[in-house]
Amino acid sequence: MALDKDQFIEDLKGASITDLNDLVKAIEDEFGVSAAAPVAAAGAAGGAAEAKTSFNVELTSGGSAKIKVIKAVREITGAGLKDAKDMVDNAPSVIKEDVSEDEANELKAKLEEAGATVEVK
């Protein structure tokens, strides 16, 4: 008897959670495998392949036009003059955390236009 994949999937859809759990345990016993290991490996690989949705904008160097960069940092962060100067002087420093890719690229362009070296991570 040939196993029809589509019919098998339909049967699985109709099964209860308890039945599916018993099926997984039976497969583990029959083939000597663990469902936990492949799931963890697939999860780790899938996590790396997923598109990143949250980015950090990191100032790696203030460049030679520090005053322009400090002004840009103040505008982006809303920080005071001393805090913005400290961020530029103590580079590398994270200027903005957990922003969208578009916003991160806009901020990077603005900082680079002022003369800074920036990385989006």
UniProtKB/Swiss-Prot annotation:
It comes from the Bacteria. GO terms for biological process: translation. The keyword Zinc does not apply. The keyword Cell inner membrane does not apply. Pfam families: Ribosomal_L12 (PF00542), Ribosomal_L12_N (PF16320). Keywords: Ribonucleoprotein, Ribosomal protein. Transmembrane segments: none annotated. InterPro entries: Ribosomal_bL12, Ribosomal_bL12_C, Ribosomal_bL12_C/ClpS-like, Ribosomal_bL12_oligo, Ribosomal_bL12_oligo_N_sf. GO terms for molecular function: mRNA binding; structural constituent of ribosome. GO terms for cellular component: cytosolic large ribosomal subunit. Homodimer. Part of the ribosomal stalk of the 50S ribosomal subunit. Forms a multimeric L10(L12)X complex, where L10 forms an elongated spine to which 2 to 4 L12 dimers bind in a sequential fashion. Binds GTP-bound translation factors. Belongs to the bacterial ribosomal protein bL12 family. Forms part of the ribosomal stalk which helps the ribosome interact with GTP-bound translation factors. Is thus essential for accurate translation. This is Large ribosomal subunit protein bL12. It comes from Pediococcus pentosaceus (strain ATCC 25745 / CCUG 21536 / LMG 10740 / 183-1w). The gene is rplL.
